[in-house]
Amino acid sequence: MLNTTSVTEFLLLGVTDIQELQPFLFVVFLTIYFISVAGNGAILMIVISDPRLHSPMYFFLGNLSCLDICYSSVTLPKMLQNFLSAHKAISFLGCISQLHFFHFLGSTEAMLLAVMAFDRFVAICKPLRYTVIMNPQLCTQMAITIWMIGFFHALLHSLMTSRLNFCGSNRIYHFFCDVKPLLKLACGNTELNQWLLSTVTGTIAMGPFFLTLLSYFYIITHLFFKTHSFSMLRKALSTCASHFMVVILLYAPVLFTYIHHASGTSMDQDRITAIMYTVVTPVLNPLIYTLRNKEVKGAFNRAMKRWLWPKEILKNSSEA
């Protein structure tokens, strides 16, 4: 059955209806977007260029930085455009594409965090077998697998949403196209779409979350009951602190949005929580990893010296 929609475009009503705030919000979110792309881009380049960071942990960190750059680029450029535009329209195809990439990158990031937690579990609980278990082939296979699962999960949502009939209002009370606000505009039966959102997306969100918690549970019990050393426990948890903070930043708003969507939360609440995981989390991830990770800070300092040192040589030679 072909899509019989009569709607050719949607109107994204944005973050706020107060026109006086639009220029201010444009500057704020443009700054956030620049910091997010620059910070995650710097981590990605450092992980690629520094041989000391060619390990499974930083391989996955590079994947996370790449995801965060793409993730924020799915929603923020259109949001910035709409801050300065009177006609805040997005085409039907553009809306479905935005929905697809949003769920593709979001679900991939959720699974990636679970893989990163497993990597920490192997490193702490099975240190002698770490290089054997987390070999480059396995790391590459896991990365490709979660990217593919995320893609096909998003494809399912985008195909099912594109087949709905939109025959009424085209005003989306959100700053980007997502499944939940689109289902509110659809005519006809959306029970299957609601089921996909609750069950499939809920499983992809909650499954990795519980696997992450399970990894940390095994790490804590292993160190506490087998080593009986609080100092080792504190040291191990310190190395995992950055990852755990990122997990909390991502899952707190995601759980609020997708697990409680059936309770009828307002669109204003949805927009606020969406800002947390689409805007705030990607910009905080590089800050968390650079501030709490000595290896990343060291690699960043070495990279800065490599980039700045030739300039000092040229400056001294020209003065001579």
UniProtKB/Swiss-Prot annotation:
InterPro entries: GPCR_Rhodpsn, GPCR_Rhodpsn_7TM, Olfact_rcpt, Olfactory_GPCR. Residues 45-55, 119-141, 225-238, 292-320 are cytoplasmic. CDD domains: 7tmA_OR12D-like (cd15915). Disulfide bonds join 95-177. One of its GO terms (biological process) is detection of chemical stimulus involved in sensory perception of smell. Its main location: membrane. It is a multi-pass membrane protein. Keywords: Cell membrane, Disulfide bond, G-protein coupled receptor, Glycoprotein, Membrane, Olfaction, Receptor, Sensory transduction, Transducer, Transmembrane, Transmembrane helix. GO terms for cellular component: membrane; plasma membrane. It holds the Pfam family 7tm_4. It is found in: Cell membrane. Glycans are attached at residue 3. Residues 1-23, 77-97, 163-203, 260-270 are extracellular. The chain crosses the membrane at residues 24-44, 56-76, 98-118, 142-162, 204-224, 239-259, 271-291. One of its GO terms (molecular function) is olfactory receptor activity. Odorant receptor. Belongs to the G-protein coupled receptor 1 family. This is Olfactory receptor 12D1. The lineage of its organism: Eukaryota, Metazoa, Chordata, Craniata, Vertebrata.
